[in-house]
Amino acid sequence: MNLETQFDKVLYRHDEVRAQLSSGEGMDSQTIQRLSKELSELDPVVTAVQAFRKAREDMVQAAEMMNDPDMKDLAEEEFYALKERLPALEREVQIMLLPKDEADEKNAIIEVRAGTGGEEAALFAAELFRMYERYAGLHGWRFEVMDVNDTGIGGVKEASATITGRNVFARLKFESGVHRVQRVPATESQGRIHTSAATVAIMPEAEEVDIQLNDSDLRFDVYRSQGSGGQSVNTTDSAVRVTHIPTGLAVACQQEKSQHKNKATALKLLRARLYERERSAKDAERAAARKSQVGSGDRSERIRTYNFPQGRVTDHRINMTLYKIDAVMSGDALDELVEALVAADQAERLAEME
Protein backbone atom coordinates (compact mmCIF):
# COMPACT_ATOMS: atom_id res chain seq x y z
CA MET A 1 0.00 0.00 0.00
CA ASN A 2 1.51 3.35 -1.04
CA LEU A 3 1.69 6.32 1.28
CA GLU A 4 -1.12 8.30 -0.35
CA THR A 5 -3.52 5.35 0.00
CA GLN A 6 -2.57 5.09 3.67
CA PHE A 7 -3.25 8.81 4.10
CA ASP A 8 -6.68 8.47 2.50
CA LYS A 9 -7.55 5.51 4.72
CA VAL A 10 -6.65 7.47 7.85
CA LEU A 11 -8.72 10.50 6.79
CA TYR A 12 -11.69 8.29 5.87
CA ARG A 13 -11.55 6.42 9.18
CA HIS A 14 -11.25 9.70 11.10
CA ASP A 15 -14.41 11.06 9.44
CA GLU A 16 -16.19 7.74 10.00
CA VAL A 17 -15.40 7.58 13.73
CA ARG A 18 -16.30 11.23 14.25
CA ALA A 19 -19.65 10.69 12.50
CA GLN A 20 -20.40 7.62 14.63
CA LEU A 21 -19.68 9.52 17.83
CA SER A 22 -21.80 12.46 16.70
CA SER A 23 -24.84 10.27 16.07
CA GLY A 24 -24.29 8.02 19.08
CA GLU A 25 -27.12 5.76 17.93
CA GLY A 26 -27.34 2.38 19.65
CA MET A 27 -23.90 2.66 21.26
CA ASP A 28 -23.17 1.59 24.80
CA SER A 29 -20.68 3.40 27.03
CA GLN A 30 -17.93 0.87 26.26
CA THR A 31 -18.25 1.45 22.49
CA ILE A 32 -18.27 5.22 22.97
CA GLN A 33 -15.14 4.96 25.12
CA ARG A 34 -13.38 2.78 22.52
CA LEU A 35 -14.28 5.11 19.63
CA SER A 36 -13.30 8.21 21.62
CA LYS A 37 -9.89 6.65 22.28
CA GLU A 38 -9.48 5.80 18.59
CA LEU A 39 -10.44 9.36 17.60
CA SER A 40 -7.90 10.85 20.01
CA GLU A 41 -5.22 8.61 18.44
CA LEU A 42 -6.27 9.56 14.89
CA ASP A 43 -6.41 13.33 15.52
CA PRO A 44 -2.63 13.97 15.55
CA VAL A 45 -2.14 11.70 12.51
CA VAL A 46 -4.77 13.63 10.53
CA THR A 47 -3.16 16.93 11.55
CA ALA A 48 0.23 15.65 10.35
CA VAL A 49 -1.21 14.35 7.05
CA GLN A 50 -2.94 17.67 6.39
CA ALA A 51 0.26 19.60 7.20
CA PHE A 52 2.25 17.42 4.77
CA ARG A 53 -0.29 17.77 1.95
CA LYS A 54 -0.62 21.54 2.51
CA ALA A 55 3.16 21.98 2.35
CA ARG A 56 3.31 19.92 -0.85
CA GLU A 57 0.53 21.99 -2.47
CA ASP A 58 2.21 25.23 -1.40
CA MET A 59 5.46 24.02 -2.96
CA VAL A 60 3.72 23.34 -6.30
CA GLN A 61 2.16 26.82 -6.20
CA ALA A 62 5.51 28.40 -5.38
CA ALA A 63 7.07 26.58 -8.35
CA GLU A 64 4.40 28.03 -10.65
CA MET A 65 4.90 31.54 -9.22
CA MET A 66 8.61 31.35 -10.02
CA ASN A 67 7.63 32.02 -13.67
CA ASP A 68 6.33 35.46 -12.66
CA PRO A 69 9.26 37.94 -12.75
CA ASP A 70 7.68 40.07 -10.02
CA MET A 71 7.26 37.10 -7.66
CA LYS A 72 10.32 35.05 -8.67
CA ASP A 73 12.60 35.86 -5.70
CA LEU A 74 9.89 35.43 -3.07
CA ALA A 75 8.56 32.26 -4.73
CA GLU A 76 12.05 30.73 -4.94
CA GLU A 77 12.66 31.37 -1.27
CA GLU A 78 9.35 29.72 -0.33
CA PHE A 79 9.89 26.83 -2.74
CA TYR A 80 13.30 25.82 -1.37
CA ALA A 81 12.18 26.29 2.25
CA LEU A 82 9.24 23.94 1.66
CA LYS A 83 11.40 21.49 -0.30
CA GLU A 84 13.73 21.25 2.69
CA ARG A 85 10.85 20.86 5.17
CA LEU A 86 8.80 18.30 3.23
CA PRO A 87 10.90 15.14 3.94
CA ALA A 88 10.69 15.76 7.71
CA LEU A 89 6.90 16.16 7.51
CA GLU A 90 6.62 12.96 5.47
CA ARG A 91 8.79 11.04 7.93
CA GLU A 92 6.69 12.31 10.84
CA VAL A 93 3.54 10.88 9.25
CA GLN A 94 5.28 7.61 8.33
CA ILE A 95 6.36 7.13 11.95
CA MET A 96 2.80 7.76 13.12
CA LEU A 97 1.54 5.12 10.67
CA LEU A 98 3.95 2.42 11.87
CA PRO A 99 2.15 -0.58 13.40
CA LYS A 100 1.71 -0.07 17.12
CA ASP A 101 3.02 -2.50 19.73
CA GLU A 102 -0.10 -3.36 21.72
CA ALA A 103 1.95 -3.26 24.91
CA ASP A 104 3.45 0.21 24.41
CA GLU A 105 0.78 1.96 26.46
CA LYS A 106 1.03 -0.49 29.34
CA ASN A 107 2.79 -0.02 32.63
CA ALA A 108 6.02 -1.97 33.05
CA ILE A 109 7.54 -4.41 35.47
CA ILE A 110 11.30 -4.19 35.82
CA GLU A 111 13.54 -6.98 37.07
CA VAL A 112 17.23 -6.37 37.75
CA ARG A 113 19.52 -9.32 38.52
CA ALA A 114 23.19 -9.45 39.44
CA GLY A 115 25.12 -11.43 36.82
CA THR A 116 28.78 -12.40 36.75
CA GLY A 117 31.09 -10.52 39.10
CA GLY A 118 30.06 -11.49 42.63
CA GLU A 119 29.47 -8.67 45.12
CA GLU A 120 30.52 -6.01 42.62
CA ALA A 121 27.79 -7.23 40.23
CA ALA A 122 25.26 -7.06 43.08
CA LEU A 123 26.32 -3.48 43.90
CA PHE A 124 25.98 -2.49 40.24
CA ALA A 125 22.55 -4.16 40.04
CA ALA A 126 21.44 -2.02 43.00
CA GLU A 127 22.75 1.12 41.28
CA LEU A 128 20.86 0.26 38.08
CA PHE A 129 17.67 -0.30 40.08
CA ARG A 130 18.08 3.13 41.69
CA MET A 131 18.83 4.68 38.28
CA TYR A 132 15.48 3.49 36.92
CA GLU A 133 13.73 4.63 40.09
CA ARG A 134 15.15 8.15 39.66
CA TYR A 135 14.36 8.10 35.93
CA ALA A 136 10.75 7.18 36.72
CA GLY A 137 10.58 10.08 39.18
CA LEU A 138 11.84 12.53 36.55
CA HIS A 139 9.00 11.45 34.25
CA GLY A 140 6.35 11.62 36.94
CA TRP A 141 5.87 7.85 36.91
CA ARG A 142 5.12 5.84 40.04
CA PHE A 143 7.85 3.36 41.02
CA GLU A 144 6.65 0.68 43.44
CA VAL A 145 9.13 -1.89 44.72
CA MET A 146 7.75 -5.42 44.44
CA ASP A 147 10.57 -7.52 45.85
CA VAL A 148 14.24 -7.10 46.77
CA ASN A 149 16.74 -9.84 47.56
CA ASP A 150 19.64 -7.86 49.01
CA THR A 151 23.15 -8.86 50.03
CA GLY A 152 23.20 -6.87 53.26
CA ILE A 153 26.11 -4.65 52.19
CA GLY A 154 24.41 -2.45 49.61
CA GLY A 155 24.00 -4.87 46.73
CA VAL A 156 21.03 -6.79 45.39
CA LYS A 157 20.93 -10.29 43.95
CA GLU A 158 17.55 -9.53 42.41
CA ALA A 159 15.06 -6.66 42.60
CA SER A 160 11.74 -5.97 40.90
CA ALA A 161 9.32 -3.05 40.72
CA THR A 162 6.18 -1.87 38.96
CA ILE A 163 6.49 1.40 37.02
CA THR A 164 3.17 3.11 36.38
CA GLY A 165 2.60 6.03 34.02
CA ARG A 166 2.03 7.13 30.45
CA ASN A 167 3.78 5.03 27.76
CA VAL A 168 6.15 3.49 30.31
CA PHE A 169 6.75 0.25 28.42
CA ALA A 170 7.23 2.09 25.11
CA ARG A 171 10.03 4.14 26.67
CA LEU A 172 11.74 1.43 28.70
CA LYS A 173 11.44 -1.74 26.60
CA PHE A 174 14.84 -1.23 24.98
CA GLU A 175 16.53 -1.35 28.40
CA SER A 176 16.16 -5.15 28.48
CA GLY A 177 19.53 -6.82 28.26
CA VAL A 178 22.93 -7.30 29.85
CA HIS A 179 24.51 -4.16 31.28
CA ARG A 180 28.27 -4.41 31.84
CA VAL A 181 30.25 -2.31 34.30
CA GLN A 182 34.00 -1.67 34.31
CA ARG A 183 35.51 -0.01 37.38
CA VAL A 184 37.83 -0.43 40.35
CA PRO A 185 35.85 -1.96 43.25
CA ALA A 186 36.14 -0.31 46.67
CA THR A 187 37.67 -3.55 48.00
CA GLU A 188 40.36 -3.68 45.27
CA SER A 189 43.71 -2.80 46.89
CA GLN A 190 45.77 -3.05 43.68
CA GLY A 191 43.64 -0.54 41.75
CA ARG A 192 42.74 -3.07 39.07
CA ILE A 193 39.65 -2.56 36.92
CA HIS A 194 37.08 -5.32 37.30
CA THR A 195 34.32 -6.23 34.85
CA SER A 196 30.90 -7.27 36.15
CA ALA A 197 27.42 -7.58 34.71
CA ALA A 198 23.77 -7.24 35.63
CA THR A 199 20.69 -8.11 33.60
CA VAL A 200 17.65 -5.92 33.18
CA ALA A 201 14.30 -7.30 32.00
CA ILE A 202 11.45 -4.92 31.17
CA MET A 203 8.05 -6.58 30.81
CA PRO A 204 4.63 -5.07 30.12
CA GLU A 205 2.34 -5.31 33.13
CA ALA A 206 -0.27 -7.93 32.28
CA GLU A 207 -3.91 -7.56 33.26
CA GLU A 208 -6.27 -10.42 33.95
CA VAL A 209 -7.77 -9.98 30.49
CA ASP A 210 -4.29 -10.55 28.99
CA ILE A 211 -3.40 -13.65 31.02
CA GLN A 212 -5.93 -15.75 32.90
CA LEU A 213 -4.51 -17.93 35.66
CA ASN A 214 -6.39 -21.07 36.63
CA ASP A 215 -6.12 -22.10 40.28
CA SER A 216 -5.55 -25.70 39.21
CA ASP A 217 -2.40 -24.61 37.32
CA LEU A 218 -0.83 -22.93 40.35
CA ARG A 219 1.13 -24.30 43.29
CA PHE A 220 1.74 -22.09 46.31
CA ASP A 221 4.53 -22.61 48.84
CA VAL A 222 4.95 -20.45 51.93
CA TYR A 223 8.10 -20.05 54.01
CA ARG A 224 9.78 -17.60 56.35
CA SER A 225 11.36 -14.50 54.84
CA GLN A 226 15.14 -14.66 54.62
CA GLY A 227 17.34 -11.62 55.15
CA SER A 228 20.87 -11.11 53.92
CA GLY A 229 23.08 -14.03 54.93
CA GLY A 230 20.07 -16.34 55.02
CA GLN A 231 18.84 -15.52 58.52
CA SER A 232 15.09 -15.50 59.13
CA VAL A 233 13.67 -11.99 59.46
CA ASN A 234 10.11 -13.00 60.25
CA THR A 235 8.50 -15.32 62.75
CA THR A 236 5.63 -16.23 60.43
CA ASP A 237 5.49 -17.92 57.04
CA SER A 238 4.89 -14.69 55.10
CA ALA A 239 7.09 -15.32 52.05
CA VAL A 240 5.31 -16.87 49.06
CA ARG A 241 6.52 -18.84 46.06
CA VAL A 242 4.02 -19.50 43.28
CA THR A 243 4.75 -22.01 40.52
CA HIS A 244 2.88 -22.14 37.21
CA ILE A 245 2.74 -25.91 36.74
CA PRO A 246 2.19 -26.03 32.93
CA THR A 247 5.29 -23.93 32.19
CA GLY A 248 7.38 -24.49 35.32
CA LEU A 249 7.77 -20.73 35.83
CA ALA A 250 8.17 -19.86 39.51
CA VAL A 251 8.08 -16.50 41.27
CA ALA A 252 8.90 -15.79 44.91
CA CYS A 253 8.13 -12.70 46.96
CA GLN A 254 9.05 -11.86 50.55
CA GLN A 255 9.06 -8.05 50.51
CA GLU A 256 5.97 -7.54 52.70
CA LYS A 257 5.21 -8.85 56.18
CA SER A 258 1.78 -9.88 54.92
CA GLN A 259 1.51 -13.26 53.20
CA HIS A 260 -1.57 -11.97 51.34
CA LYS A 261 0.36 -9.00 49.88
CA ASN A 262 3.32 -11.19 48.91
CA LYS A 263 0.97 -13.61 47.17
CA ALA A 264 -0.65 -10.78 45.20
CA THR A 265 2.76 -9.43 44.17
CA ALA A 266 4.02 -12.88 43.14
CA LEU A 267 0.91 -13.43 41.00
CA LYS A 268 1.37 -10.02 39.37
CA LEU A 269 4.96 -10.84 38.49
CA LEU A 270 4.05 -14.33 37.27
CA ARG A 271 1.31 -12.90 35.05
CA ALA A 272 3.81 -10.43 33.54
CA ARG A 273 6.33 -13.20 32.82
CA LEU A 274 3.67 -15.38 31.20
CA TYR A 275 2.41 -12.46 29.13
CA GLU A 276 5.91 -11.67 27.94
CA ARG A 277 6.43 -15.34 27.12
CA GLU A 278 3.21 -15.38 25.10
CA ARG A 279 4.13 -12.19 23.23
CA SER A 280 7.51 -13.65 22.35
CA ALA A 281 5.99 -16.89 21.11
CA LYS A 282 3.66 -14.97 18.77
CA ASP A 283 6.50 -12.96 17.30
CA ALA A 284 9.57 -14.97 16.30
CA GLU A 285 11.65 -11.84 15.64
CA ARG A 286 10.83 -10.42 19.03
CA ALA A 287 11.66 -13.74 20.67
CA ALA A 288 15.08 -13.72 19.02
CA ALA A 289 15.67 -10.12 20.09
CA ARG A 290 14.73 -10.86 23.70
CA LYS A 291 16.99 -13.91 23.81
CA SER A 292 20.00 -11.91 22.65
CA GLN A 293 19.21 -8.97 24.92
CA VAL A 294 18.33 -10.62 28.21
CA GLY A 295 20.68 -13.59 28.00
CA SER A 296 22.11 -15.23 31.09
CA GLY A 297 23.91 -12.31 32.71
CA ASP A 298 27.26 -13.42 31.33
CA ARG A 299 29.69 -10.57 30.63
CA SER A 300 30.18 -11.69 27.00
CA GLU A 301 26.58 -10.77 26.15
CA ARG A 302 26.10 -7.06 26.49
CA ILE A 303 23.94 -4.25 25.17
CA ARG A 304 25.59 -1.46 27.17
CA THR A 305 28.87 -0.83 28.95
CA TYR A 306 29.36 1.59 31.85
CA ASN A 307 33.07 2.43 32.09
CA PHE A 308 33.64 4.48 35.25
CA PRO A 309 37.40 5.22 34.84
CA GLN A 310 36.67 6.77 31.42
CA GLY A 311 33.37 8.30 32.53
CA ARG A 312 31.56 6.84 29.55
CA VAL A 313 28.45 4.83 28.76
CA THR A 314 28.33 2.99 25.42
CA ASP A 315 25.24 1.38 23.92
CA HIS A 316 26.57 -1.27 21.57
CA ARG A 317 23.35 -1.72 19.58
CA ILE A 318 23.49 1.79 18.15
CA ASN A 319 27.21 2.52 18.70
CA MET A 320 26.38 5.54 20.85
CA THR A 321 28.72 6.77 23.58
CA LEU A 322 28.01 9.42 26.20
CA TYR A 323 30.83 10.81 28.34
CA LYS A 324 28.53 11.66 31.22
CA ILE A 325 28.27 8.50 33.27
CA ASP A 326 27.19 10.28 36.47
CA ALA A 327 24.31 11.99 34.66
CA VAL A 328 23.21 8.66 33.17
CA MET A 329 23.35 6.87 36.53
CA SER A 330 21.33 9.66 38.14
CA GLY A 331 18.67 9.19 35.46
CA ASP A 332 19.13 12.70 34.07
CA ALA A 333 20.89 11.73 30.82
CA LEU A 334 19.25 8.33 30.34
CA ASP A 335 16.69 9.93 28.02
CA GLU A 336 19.44 10.61 25.47
CA LEU A 337 19.99 6.87 25.12
CA VAL A 338 16.27 6.06 25.25
CA GLU A 339 15.45 8.61 22.52
CA ALA A 340 18.25 7.31 20.30
CA LEU A 341 17.08 3.70 20.71
CA VAL A 342 13.47 4.63 19.91
CA ALA A 343 14.64 6.53 16.81
CA ALA A 344 16.81 3.58 15.69
CA ASP A 345 13.87 1.20 16.09
CA GLN A 346 11.63 3.51 14.06
CA ALA A 347 14.26 3.79 11.32
CA GLU A 348 14.60 0.00 11.15
CA ARG A 349 10.85 -0.50 10.86
CA LEU A 350 10.52 2.23 8.23
CA ALA A 351 13.28 0.56 6.20
CA GLU A 352 11.41 -2.75 6.38
CA MET A 353 8.27 -1.10 4.99
CA GLU A 354 10.06 0.43 2.00
Curated annotation (Swiss-Prot):
<dbReference type="InterPro" id="IPR050057">
    <property type="entry name" value="Prokaryotic/Mito_RF"/>
</dbReference>
<comment type="similarity">
    <text>Belongs to the prokaryotic/mitochondrial release factor family.</text>
</comment>
<comment type="function">
    <text>Peptide chain release factor 1 directs the termination of translation in response to the peptide chain termination codons UAG and UAA.</text>
</comment>
<keyword id="KW-0963">Cytoplasm</keyword>
<protein>
    <recommendedName>
        <fullName>Peptide chain release factor 1</fullName>
    </recommendedName>
</protein>
<keyword id="KW-0648">Protein biosynthesis</keyword>
<dbReference type="InterPro" id="IPR000352">
    <property type="entry name" value="Pep_chain_release_fac_I"/>
</dbReference>
<dbReference type="Pfam" id="PF03462">
    <property type="entry name" value="PCRF"/>
</dbReference>
<dbReference type="InterPro" id="IPR005139">
    <property type="entry name" value="PCRF"/>
</dbReference>
<dbReference type="InterPro" id="IPR045853">
    <property type="entry name" value="Pep_chain_release_fac_I_sf"/>
</dbReference>
<dbReference type="InterPro" id="IPR004373">
    <property type="entry name" value="RF-1"/>
</dbReference>
<keyword id="KW-0488">Methylation</keyword>
<feature type="region of interest" description="Disordered">
    <location>
        <begin position="283"/>
        <end position="308"/>
    </location>
</feature>
<feature type="modified residue" description="N5-methylglutamine">
    <location>
        <position position="231"/>
    </location>
</feature>
<dbReference type="GO" id="GO:0016149">
    <property type="term" value="F:translation release factor activity, codon specific"/>
</dbReference>
<dbReference type="Pfam" id="PF00472">
    <property type="entry name" value="RF-1"/>
</dbReference>
<dbReference type="GO" id="GO:0005737">
    <property type="term" value="C:cytoplasm"/>
</dbReference>
